[in-house]
């Protein structure tokens, strides 16, 4: 272990990374809500500090593309991958400089379609209990919109409208929208739940068109009009050279999952209803495919004393839970080793990390990530600390997986910066 790893991780007091009160939904960042999104100001500041000139940027857990958008409007060639098909769809829409004339023509066509008589639904989701999650009138109107979407042949237009449709599905469903996991509204609230499907869609489209206008202006003023590349590879298993060549990336900016989907953010459950309506692949298996989705059989040692001690403490309380947590760190370590291979010498890796609790035990993810990078020839540059005033997270969660047992969620994040030797 290097001398760097023994030093306290701190931030210069005057260097504020909290961005309290900042506008986080500018440009195409307004397109779609998503759990635990990194705010664009963090990515923008990291790019300005560590990659001010156009280069190649990678986000190996890109989610809805926050860092990719910020890189693209600064002239970077951006690459992102994510295992959640809905996240990739949202990213694709946010990164597409769609011509406004084509969009407005399509919007006029959609408006005419919405005003036309609603026919018999031709295609309905089969992977969910439809009448449990949606009222009959909502199903009818969503199917009407979906039929129009199926007529679109342009990939960029289809992504734009599909993203607005996705949020409409979620907001007009019987699911609680204040939860990441899939819970039905209580009966009392259901009785008062009369969503306006077409009105909701129109509002999303107006908002997203305004965001697109901002994005197009920023993209046009970039040092160069670069390209965005979205991939579907699993960085835990490897990064194909055909997608990203070894030692070709100058900067990595990412916010990996806080932990496995069992008790942290269940991205698959959050996406499930939209994914079914959009007929996205593997909608029911997303959470299991993410890091830590498959528990280990034995508790390993990670050679990070604080992490190993925390896992042993959790194991003494709940062996199953400890093995789930350990699986996440094993996958994270493998992913970092693969990411390291595509970073050029002197390249920078910036990881925005939250240290969560499981069974009341604080897990030192920042220390673990630093150690994992040090074992693949990176050195620690700095770690900035920030409060979390504006990331969409629940105030309390159930880190023990026991009903009624809750704990406070993370209120701070570490921004770990490493450099490849």
Task: Put a short name on every predicted segment.
Residues 1-53:
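S-adenosyl-L-methionine
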Residues 43, 57-74, 78-85, 91, ...:
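Conserved proline-anchored active-site loop of SAM-dependent methyltransferases
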Residues 85-152, 270-300:
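Conserved phosphoryl-transfer catalytic core
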Residues 139-254, 259-265:
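SAM-dependent nucleic-acid methyltransferase catalytic core
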Residues 258-338:
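SAM-dependent methyltransferase catalytic-core segment centered on the flexible catalytic loop
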Residues 335-345, 376:
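Conserved helix-to-beta-strand junction in the class I
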Residues 344, 399-421:
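Core SAM-dependent methyltransferase catalytic element
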Residues 378-389:
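Conserved S-adenosyl-L-methionine
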């Amino acid at each position: 272990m290097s001398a760097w790893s023994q030093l306290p991780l701190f931030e210069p007091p005057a260097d504020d990374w909290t961005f309290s009160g900042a506008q986080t939904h500018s440009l195409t960042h307004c397109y779609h809500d998503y759990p635990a999104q990194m705010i664009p100001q963090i990515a923008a500041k990291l790019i300005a500090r560590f990659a001010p000139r156009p280069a190649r940027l990678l986000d190996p857990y890109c989610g809805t593309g926050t860092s990719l958008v910020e890189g693209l409007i600064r002239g970077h060639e951006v690459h992102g991958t994510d295992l959640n098909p809905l996240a990739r769809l949202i990213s694709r829409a946010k990164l597409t400089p769609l011509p406004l004339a084509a969009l407005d023509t399509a919007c006029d066509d959609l408006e005419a379609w919405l005003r036309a008589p609603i026919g018999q639904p031709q295609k309905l989701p089969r992977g969910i209990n439809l009448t449990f999650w949606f009222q009959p009138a909502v199903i009818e109107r969503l199917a009407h919109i979906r039929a129009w979407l199926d007529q679109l042949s342009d990939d960029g237009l289809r992504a734009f409208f599909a993203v607005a449709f996705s949020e409409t599905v979620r907001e007009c469903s019987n699911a609680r929208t204040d939860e990441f996991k899939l819970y039905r509204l209580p009966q009392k609230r259901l009785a008062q739940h009369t969503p306006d499907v077409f009105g909701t869609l129109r509002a999303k489209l107006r908002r997203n068109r305004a965001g697109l206008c901002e994005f197009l202006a920023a993209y046009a003023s970039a040092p160069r009009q670069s390209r965005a590349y979205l991939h579907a590879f699993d960085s835990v298993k490897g990064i194909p050279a055909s997608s990203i060549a070894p030692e070709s990336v100058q900067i990595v900016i990412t916010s990996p999952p806080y932990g496995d989907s069992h008790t942290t953010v269940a991205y698959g459950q959050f996406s499930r209803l939209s994914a079914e309506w959009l007929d996205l692949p593997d909608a029911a298996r997303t959470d299991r495919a993410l890091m830590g989705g498959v528990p280990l059989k034995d508790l390993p040692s990670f050679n990070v004393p604080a992490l190993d001690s925390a896992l042993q403490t959790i194991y003494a309380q709940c062996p199953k839970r400890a093995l789930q947590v350990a699986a996440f760190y094993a996958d994270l370590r493998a992913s970092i080793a693969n990411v390291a291979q595509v970073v050029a010498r002197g390249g920078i890796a910036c990881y925005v990390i939250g240290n969560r609790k499981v069974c009341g035990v604080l897990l030192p993810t920042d220390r673990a990530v630093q150690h994992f990078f040090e074992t693949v020839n990176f050195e620690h540059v700095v770690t900035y600390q920030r409060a979390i005033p504006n990331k969409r997270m629940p105030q309390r969660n159930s880190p023990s997986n026991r009903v009624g047992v809750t704990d406070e969620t993370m209120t701070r994040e570490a921004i770990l910066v490493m450099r490849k030797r």
